């Protein structure tokens, strides 16, 4: 059947339009149309190409869905080897690298690019007259594998380059970069894999590599891989003189280029930026294992050349490892204050992130079983920032046959009572309210600094007092007297007096601290402050309805239900009655007089370590000027006040377009104009 000129023109128009929308959505993060509009146009193009296959072009957006499975990947010879990089681990190593370069090219002025080193899979993409032709893995640097069909499925790999100001596209250009899987996408993928009973991936890099090397490209298409371009290989028909110019050109062609790349003329600034990345890495939405420093000028790069397989003009500044392998020696169970049984790994000591790690989290029994983690396994352990180290999974290939399957507990290891799984939760609970382990954890929480702040009572004292029989419930803390400690070793007159004074002082803690101390599920310090401001007393809060609770900004349905359930439990009603009878005041904090209304109507969330000020003090400052501080980032959040190691809240704020402030910028908002 002959194809009309109108149909040919419509197919071409749809291709151009959809490629433009892809570029704005995936590369610029600035969608031009809704998902429904995009899908409608894509379906129209699919229908045309199904009826007229001759109109299906290599750069068509319909080609991103994957093609027929392959039996194996063909080999590809890289025309110019994909080199490895030498490593630097500190400022001295960076300075030594620079001196070696100066010995060859002299002490002439140099500029440097500094780029995040994405922890993914290096690939090379060849474009002929602007059209994506061949894509290959790095392989051994000289020979890789042809994974063109899989690379076509990645949304921010352009299938056709965008011309620059009417200039002709290069006749041939090889673009090099990194395929990676964002952390959130990695976690979602592993959840799906575990739910389906399939192998979970140890880390985002392995997931990206495994996804790219699928013989069936429809599997690759189902996984949200991303791509950052960072270099070119051989090229013709375009003039490129520096790394910075190359990145700008690639960005204009339609590639995603890491926005955190910087150009410096001062080498000290290079070192400072490398150090800055040591703290920033935790706030990223993707994994990095260092930064790459390159001498910017291509003429200098050619003069410096290569030694072995490493270019003299570039070096990788490597961060301390966040993942290591070690042996799982045992699995022990801790019991939390809610009765949750928490499995913990006992490990052969391993250095991780600058510290020696011997224990790590295993989350819950379902996590261990779904990943088939066995005692004696070689396991991958990860530590990120201040997060407790945790076991990612076993290295199955390293098994010897001596490993032991872990038996999930059926009874509490402390009190011996049968355990239960509540509702749809994956966690296992000890439901014995008199379990000593639960009581000890509850005491620790009650006396903690963010709650009742009883100086002289901590983890060790809580365990001792329970073992001595002095404390059998939280109210027993307020029944302690001098006679309770009579003759007990380590508790002299002065120490006992100080402890009893601290306990007496805690009776005057404000209502929000008492609510925090009660340990209601989902109620942290911010929610506790909101509840205290609204209800003004424990009896009033105890009578609150779901409707009243959810009317408070920041209190969601699940938290409201937790509050109602807590106060409807007879044991908790008795707890509160006893505490009030023992003299607990639980009165609301005095509302500080407003210093100004400059932040009135503005909502803030605070995250990270702030310079020179605690989060509590920052919250008080914001509230003193009429602002409100919440606990989680949402579309309603006006500002995120972020310090160092800001973490996932910063990532979410950036994705929602929430303005991020430093302390200096917050102070600027408060200055008189």
Curated annotation (Swiss-Prot):
It is an enzyme of class 6 (ligase). GO terms for biological process: DNA repair; DNA replication. The active site is at 117 (n6-amp-lysine intermediate). NAD(+) binds at residues 35-39, 84-85, 115, 138, 178, 294, 318. PROSITE patterns: BRCT, DNA_LIGASE_N1. It catalyses: NAD(+) + (deoxyribonucleotide)n-3'-hydroxyl + 5'-phospho-(deoxyribonucleotide)m = (deoxyribonucleotide)n+m + AMP + beta-nicotinamide D-nucleotide. This is DNA ligase. The gene is ligA. Keywords: DNA damage, DNA repair, DNA replication, Ligase, Magnesium, Manganese, Metal-binding, NAD, Zinc. SUPFAM superfamilies: BRCT domain (SSF52113), DNA ligase/mRNA capping enzyme, catalytic domain (SSF56091), Nucleic acid-binding proteins (SSF50249), RuvA domain 2-like (SSF47781). DNA ligase that catalyzes the formation of phosphodiester linkages between 5'-phosphoryl and 3'-hydroxyl groups in double-stranded DNA using NAD as a coenzyme and as the energy source for the reaction. It is essential for DNA replication and repair of damaged DNA. Residues 594-673 form the BRCT domain. InterPro entries: BRCT_dom, BRCT_dom_sf, DisA/LigA_HHH, DNA_ligase, DNA_ligase_AS, DNAligase_adenylation, DNAligase_N, Hlx-hairpin-Hlx_DNA-bd_motif. Its EC number is 6.5.1.2. Gene3D superfamilies: 5' to 3' exonuclease, C-terminal subdomain, 6.20.10.30, BRCT domain, DNA ligase/mRNA capping enzyme, Helix hairpin bin, Nucleic acid-binding proteins. Zn(2+) binds at residues 412, 415, 430, 435. Pfam families: BRCT (PF00533), DNA_ligase_aden (PF01653), DNA_ligase_OB (PF03120), DNA_ligase_ZBD (PF03119), HHH_2 (PF12826). Its cofactor is Mg(2+); Mn(2+). Belongs to the NAD-dependent DNA ligase family. LigA subfamily. The keyword tRNA-binding does not apply. PANTHER family: CHROMOSOME TRANSMISSION FIDELITY FACTOR 18, DNA LIGASE. GO terms for cellular component: cytosol. The keyword Acyltransferase does not apply. GO terms for molecular function: DNA binding; DNA ligase (NAD+) activity; metal ion binding.
């Amino acid at each position: 059947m002959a194809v009309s000129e109108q149909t040919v023109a419509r197919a071409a128009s749809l291709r151009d339009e959809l490629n433009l929308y892809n570029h704005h959505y995936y590369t610029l993060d600035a969608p031009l149309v809704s998902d429904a509009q995009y899908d409608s146009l894509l379906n129209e193009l699919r229908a045309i190409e199904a009826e007229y296959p001759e109109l299906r072009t290599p750069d068509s957006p319909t080609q991103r869905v994957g093609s027929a499975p392959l039996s194996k990947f063909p080999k590809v010879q890289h025309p110019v080897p994909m080199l490895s990089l030498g490593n630097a681990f500190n400022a001295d190593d960076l300075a030594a690298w620079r001196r070696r370069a100066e010995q060859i090219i002299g002490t002439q002025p140099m500029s440097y690019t500094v780029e995040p080193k994405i922890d993914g899979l290096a690939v090379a993409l060849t474009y002929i007259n602007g059209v994506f032709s061949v894509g290959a893995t790095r392989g051994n640097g000289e020979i890789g594998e042809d994974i063109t069909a899989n690379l076509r499925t990645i949304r921010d790999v352009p299938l056709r380059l965008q011309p620059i100001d009417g200039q002709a596209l290069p006749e041939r250009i090889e673009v090099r970069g990194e395929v990676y899987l964002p952390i959130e996408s990695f976690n979602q993928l592993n959840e799906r894999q575990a739910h389906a009973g399939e192998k979970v991936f140890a880390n985002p890099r392995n997931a990206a590599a495994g996804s790219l090397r699928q013989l069936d490209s429809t599997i690759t298409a189902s996984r949200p891989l991303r791509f950052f371009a960072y270099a070119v290989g051989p090229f013709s028909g375009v003039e490129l003189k520096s790394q910075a110019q190359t990145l700008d050109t690639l960005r204009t062609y339609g590639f995603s280029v890491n926005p955190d790349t910087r150009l410096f003329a001062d080498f000290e600034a290079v070192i400072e930026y490398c150090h800055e990345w040591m703290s920033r890495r935790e706030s990223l939405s993707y994994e990095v294992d260092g930064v790459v420093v390159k001498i910017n000028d291509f003429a200098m790069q050619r003069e410096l050349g290569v030694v072995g397989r490493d270019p003299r003009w570039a070096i990788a500044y490597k961060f301390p490892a966040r993942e290591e392998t070690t042996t799982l020696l045992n699995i022990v169970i801790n019991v939390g204050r809610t009765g949750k049984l928490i499995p913990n790994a006992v490990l052969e000591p391993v250095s991780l992130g600058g510290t020696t790690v011997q224990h790590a989290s295993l989350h819950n029994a379902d996590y261990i079983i779904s990943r088939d983690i066995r005692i004696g396994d070689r396991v991958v352990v990860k530590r990120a920032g201040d997060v407790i180290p945790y076991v990612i999974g076993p290295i199955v290939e390293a098994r010897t046959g001596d490993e032991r399957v872990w038996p999930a507990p059926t009874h509490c290891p402390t009190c011996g009572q049968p355990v239960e799984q509540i509702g749809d939760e994956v966690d296992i609970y000890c439901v014995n309210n008199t379990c000593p382990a639960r009581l000890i954890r509850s005491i620790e929480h009650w006396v903690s600094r963010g709650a009742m702040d009883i100086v002289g009572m901590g983890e060790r004292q809580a365990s001792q007092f329970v073992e001595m029989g002095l404390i059998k419930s939280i109210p027993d803390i307020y029944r302690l007297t001098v006679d309770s400690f009579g003759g007990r070793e380590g508790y002299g007159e002065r120490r006992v007096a100080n402890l009893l004074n601290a306990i007496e002082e805690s009776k005057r803690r404000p209502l929000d601290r008492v609510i925090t101390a009660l340990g209601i599920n989902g109620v942290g310090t911010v929610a506790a402050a909101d509840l205290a401001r609204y209800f003004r007393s424990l009896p009033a809060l105890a009578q609150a309805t779901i409707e009243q609770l959810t009317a408070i900004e920041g209190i969601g349905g699940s938290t409201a239900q937790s509050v109602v359930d807590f106060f409807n439990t007879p044991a908790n009603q008795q707890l509160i009655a006893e505490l009030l009878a023992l003299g607990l005041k639980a009165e609301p904090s005095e509302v500080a007089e407003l210093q100004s209304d400059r932040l009135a109507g503005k909502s803030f969330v605070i995250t990270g370590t702030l310079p020179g000020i605690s989060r509590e003090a920052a919250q008080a400052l914001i509230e003193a000027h009429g602002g409100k501080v919440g606990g989680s980032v949402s579309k309603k959040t006006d500002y995120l006040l972020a310090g160092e190691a800001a973490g996932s809240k910063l990532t979410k704020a950036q994705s929602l377009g929430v303005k991020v402030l430093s302390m200096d910028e917050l102070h600027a908002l408060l200055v008189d104009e």
